[in-house]
């Protein structure tokens, strides 16, 4: 049972990168408004699964979207502030947070988050250099543990014709009073910064169907731990049905001390917008 829990819930670390930013990542240009736009409440949800390492998690964001300007040009057609809450969840931890963000131009999104990481399965260690096996961790302490967490993330996107490129970057800060296994990053950490980057090159070969090349890199600066992978996949959208987006990709580990070979990852994203009545 212990191993089953570990395998089933291990590391939504791959969920956080694309999910945190896809809400504004690939807009449908014909849907973008021009002229004054009303404020709105926006709900965004992404669920991911994966193998090697196992991934199963969900990220939900609920925020107030406050446009500014007339949206008279393509670059300013979705300029807005936003504030709200979001939560990353899986079987072993929750991470509720408040968020504040801005999208000054269509090509750029910036968000900051702050909130506790609540670990339901908590594994502590004597040092950052202890040896460990992610799928056979030592017994849990048996109690819920809270770790302080803050994050800033940016999304830069650009497209010409059927080709688009996205770069998603997360800067995380964790603070705990002892080394522990962080399920999100999937290694032992105590405090300090984690950098996560995901770069995608997309080619739309038919309407709302895109082929994708992907590279991602995760680093924990205190120990030099890193996770690099590259691969390819497909992204399919249907804006008319709650902006649903399905992503499936197969990556190869370039560098990871705990996992080798191929990584499969897939996610389903949907979003809803509720404009204020005028």
What is each PLM-predicted segment?
Residues 23-73, 78-80, 84-88, 271-278:
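Short glycine/proline- and aromatic-enriched beta-strand/turn motifs that initiate or cap beta-hairpins
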Residues 55-59, 218-220, 229:
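Generic detector of solvent-exposed, compositionally biased contiguous segments
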Residues 210:
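Conserved active-site beta-strand-loop modules that form the wall/rim of enzyme catalytic pockets
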Residues 1-8:
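Bacterial N-terminal signal peptides that target proteins for export
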Residues 75-123:
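Outer membrane beta-barrel
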Residues 8-18:
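Bacterial N-terminal signal peptides
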Residues 23-44, 105-207, 215, 224-241, ...:
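Outer-membrane pore/translocation modules
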């Amino acid at each position: 049972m212990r191993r089953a829990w570990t395998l089933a819930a291990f590391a939504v670390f791959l969920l956080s990168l694309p999910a945190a930013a896809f809400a504004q990542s690939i807009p449908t240009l014909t849907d973008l408004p021009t002229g004054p736009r009303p404020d709105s409440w926006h709900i965004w949800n992404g669920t991911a699964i994966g193998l090697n390492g196992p991934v199963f998690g969900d990220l939900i964001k609920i925020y107030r979207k406050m446009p500014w300007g007339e949206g008279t040009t393509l670059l300013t057609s979705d300029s807005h502030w936003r504030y709200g809450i979001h939560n990353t969840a899986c079987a072993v931890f929750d991470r509720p947070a408040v968020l504040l963000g801005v999208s000054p131009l269509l090509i750029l999104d910036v968000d900051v988050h702050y909130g506790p990481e609540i670990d339901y399965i908590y594994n502590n260690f004597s040092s950052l250099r202890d040896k460990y096996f992610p799928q056979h961790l030592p017994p849990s302490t048996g109690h819920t543990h809270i770790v302080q967490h803050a994050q800033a993330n940016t999304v830069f996107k650009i497209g010409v014709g059927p080709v688009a490129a996205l770069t998603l970057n997360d800067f995380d800060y964790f603070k705990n009073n002892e080394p522990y296994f962080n399920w999100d990053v999937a290694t032992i950490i105590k405090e300090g910064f984690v950098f996560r980057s995901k770069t995608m090159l997309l080619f739309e070969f038919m309407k709302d169907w895109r082929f994708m090349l992907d590279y991602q890199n995760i680093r924990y600066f205190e120990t030099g731990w890193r996770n690099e992978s590259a691969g390819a996949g497909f992204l399919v959208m249907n804006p008319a049905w709650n902006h649903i987006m399905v992503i499936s990709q197969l990556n190869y580990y370039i560098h990871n001390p705990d996992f080798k070979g191929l990584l499969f990852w897939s996610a389903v994203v949907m979003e809803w917008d509720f404009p204020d009545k005028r």
